[in-house]
């Protein structure tokens, strides 16, 4: 019975996180229509995503510690209520400024999903079961980035861009009702109440947590760099149509799905899987960088390294998240907040940096992805050395 309850909670958690992920990308096929309806240039509409990502990352730093003090349920319900209110504003506005503000408010609400994606599995599982649960969760979460642009394009074609936000409103209302009706409180009953600064000091004082955190930031930042650069490289440099770019853009995502599945196999050692993950990320960065040394760039030199990096990152996310969260059962909310918040902030910084670098070839992208691969490897080496002396921690 408990096992079935935990599975149901994971399914609800996948839907909770999907709301936030779909809000980020569902309107992308409708950007041209949004710009025309709001009487602004298309580039200005991109500010909607920037505002969303900023508050999505920052809000997680607050949701986690609060959930450690008052529980998971009330924090989830408050966050989703904020999202629904913001989405209602987005549906009815005719001003880009108001839409940007509403998007920032949406991110402020769905940040709770990013925290709970890392916190609830730690409440429910330990060790190998935690790794397996995180792998299943990541596999489920990876479906929404594939579906969101397709759903958004269909809704925009059949109605208009506002239908995308109406869809998000209905989806969020259904998820919120389900969690209010069936989700139990998962915060450990004997969890001590600690001050926020004390919690952060405990986490940042743990070298293992810091290493796993930097690895997770590097993994997501490498993906963000590809997402930020690939549209320009394939569209402006290679001259591909927008529809072709949209299709090619999502092709590496199944590799991340497969990586998450690969990491969740219970018969493999944690350290072995980690080595495979970090090597894939570093090798992918080099494969993305090397073609530029010879002045070569085509669809294959972009997508093959990207798919390899997505595969490595797909393995890394559940593995490193489990490694970071395992030692802190009573600080799961705060730990999840730091992991989720700093991951998104770090990826946003790297995406902004990539926009400042030359985009005439894949050299800048390859350099950034290689640096992220090096960061991941350098953070893993001390952990691997420690494991060889102490045994498997997860």
UniProtKB/Swiss-Prot annotation:
It is found in: Cell inner membrane. Its main location: membrane. One of its GO terms (biological process) is xenobiotic detoxification by transmembrane export across the plasma membrane. Signal peptide: none annotated. SUPFAM superfamilies: MFS general substrate transporter. CDD domains: MFS_MdfA_MDR_like (cd17320). GO terms for molecular function: transmembrane transporter activity; xenobiotic transmembrane transporter activity. It holds the Pfam family MFS_1. Keywords: Cell inner membrane, Cell membrane, Membrane, Transmembrane, Transmembrane helix, Transport. Gene3D superfamilies: Multidrug resistance protein D. Residues 30-46, 95, 156-162, 234-242, 298, 351-364 are periplasmic. The chain crosses the membrane at residues 9-29, 47-67, 74-94, 96-116, 135-155, 163-183, 213-233, 243-263, 277-297, 299-319, 330-350, 365-385. InterPro entries: MFS, MFS_dom, MFS_trans_sf, Multidrug-R. Belongs to the major facilitator superfamily. Multidrug resistance pump that participates in a low energy shock adaptive response. This is Multidrug resistance protein D. The gene is emrD.
């Amino acid at each position: 019975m408990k096992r079935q309850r935990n599975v149901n909670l994971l399914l609800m958690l996948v839907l909770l996180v999907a709301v936030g992920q779909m809000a980020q990308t569902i309107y992308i096929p409708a950007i041209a229509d949004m710009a025309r309806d709001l009487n602004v240039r298309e580039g200005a509409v991109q500010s909607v995503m920037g505002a969303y990502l900023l508050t999505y990352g920052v809000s997680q730093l607050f949701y986690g510690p609060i959930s450690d003090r008052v529980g998971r349920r009330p924090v989830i319900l408050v966050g989703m209520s904020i999202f629904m209110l913001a989405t209602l504003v987005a549906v009815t506005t005719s001003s880009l400024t108001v839409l940007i503000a509403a998007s920032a408010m949406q991110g402020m609400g769905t940040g709770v999903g990013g925290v709970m994606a890392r916190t609830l599995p730690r409440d429910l599982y330990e060790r190998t079961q935690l790794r397996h649960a995180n792998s299943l969760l990541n596999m489920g979460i990876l479906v929404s980035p594939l579906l969101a642009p397709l759903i958004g394009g269909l809704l925009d074609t059949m109605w208009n861009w506002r239908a995308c936000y109406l869809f998000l409103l209905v989806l969020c209302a259904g998820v919120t009702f389900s969690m209010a009706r069936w989700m139990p409180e998962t915060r450990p009953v004997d969890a001590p109440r600690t001050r926020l600064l004390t919690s952060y000091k405990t986490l940042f004082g743990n070298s293992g947590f810091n290493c796993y955190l930097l690895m997770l930031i590097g993994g997501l930042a490498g993906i963000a760099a590809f997402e930020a650069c690939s549209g320009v490289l394939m569209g402006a440099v290679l001259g591909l149509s927008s529809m072709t770019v949209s299709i090619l853009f999502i092709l590496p995502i199944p590799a991340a799905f497969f990586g998450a599945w690969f990491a969740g196999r219970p018969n493999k050692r944690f350290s072995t899987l980690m080595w495979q993950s970090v090597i894939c990320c570093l090798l992918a960065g080099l494969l993305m960088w090397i073609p530029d040394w010879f002045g070569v760039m085509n669809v294959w030199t972009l997508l093959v390294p990207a798919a390899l990096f997505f595969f490595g990152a797909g393995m890394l996310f559940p593995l490193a998240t489990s490694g970071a969260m395992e030692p802190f059962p009573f600080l799961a909310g705060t730990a999840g907040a730091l992991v989720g918040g700093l991951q998104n902030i770090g990826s946003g910084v790297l995406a902004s940096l990539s926009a400042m670098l030359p985009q005439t070839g894949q050299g800048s992208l390859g350099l950034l992805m290689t640096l992220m691969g090096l960061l991941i490897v350098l953070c893993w080496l001390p952990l691997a050395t420690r494991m060889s002396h102490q045994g498997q921690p997860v």
